Amino acid sequence: MLKKENLTEEERSKYIGILDQKANRLKILIEDLFEVSKATSKAITLNIVDVDIVSLLRQVKLELQDKIDATDLIFRWQLPEEKIVLPLDSQRTYRVFENLIVNITKYAMPHSRAYITMENTENHVKITMKNISATELDLNPSEITERFVRGDASRNTEGSGLGLAIAKSFTELQGGRLEISTDADLFTVEITFLK
C-alpha cells in the first residue's frame, strides 16, 4: 500500500501507524513465545530471594492502575495487612500477577466485579482471582493454559494467547500451583505457594 504513489500524506501516515502496531504485536508475540518456551523447558535461571508477596501484588496493582481505571470494572482487593515472605523469583512472580490482572481487564464482562484475594495459612499462601467473563467459557480449564489458546474465540482483543501459559509455567517453576476453573461465565484462577 505504501508503494502507491497516489497516497495522500494522511493515508501514508495511517498505514505506517498500522504497520507499527503490527510490528509491535509481532515483537511481543515472539518475546512471549520465547519466554514460555524457556519456561516449559526449564531453561530459565530463577533468582530466588525472600519476597513479600503481599507487597509485590500491591506493586503490580499500583503499576497497572491506569489500565484498570481505563476499564469499567470494579476490582475488589482483599489482601492481608501483614507481610508474607516467601522464597520466590520476584520478577517472574510479578509477571504472573501482571498477566492475570491484564487478562481480567481484557476478558471480564463490562460493568462487572473482579475479586482478588490472598489467603495465608500455616502451610501455604493462596491467591485467588475471580471475574465474570464477557463470554460463556466452554473450554476445558486445563486447555486454556496451553499456548495460543484464548477464551475469547472472536479474538477481538489484543494478546498473544500466551499470558496464561506463561503465568502457569512461571508459577510451577517456583514450586507453586496454578489452577483454573470455570463455571459457565465465572472464571477463577488459584495460585498456591507452599511455605
Regions found by a protein language model. Name each.
Residues G175-G176:
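Conserved glycine-rich
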Residues Q21-L26:
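Short alpha-helical segment of the dimerization/phosphotransfer core of two-component systems
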Residues L7, E11, S41-L46, V85-L88:
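Conserved micro-motifs of the catalytic ATP-binding
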Residues I104-T105:
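Short helix-loop "hinge" at the ATP-lid/N-box region of the Bergerat-fold HATPase_c
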Residues N47-Q65:
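A conserved beta-strand-to-alpha-helix junction within the catalytic ATP-binding
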Residues E136-V149:
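Short conserved segment of the HATPase_c
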Residues N47-D50, D69, I74-I84:
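Conserved catalytic submotifs in the C-terminal HATPase_c
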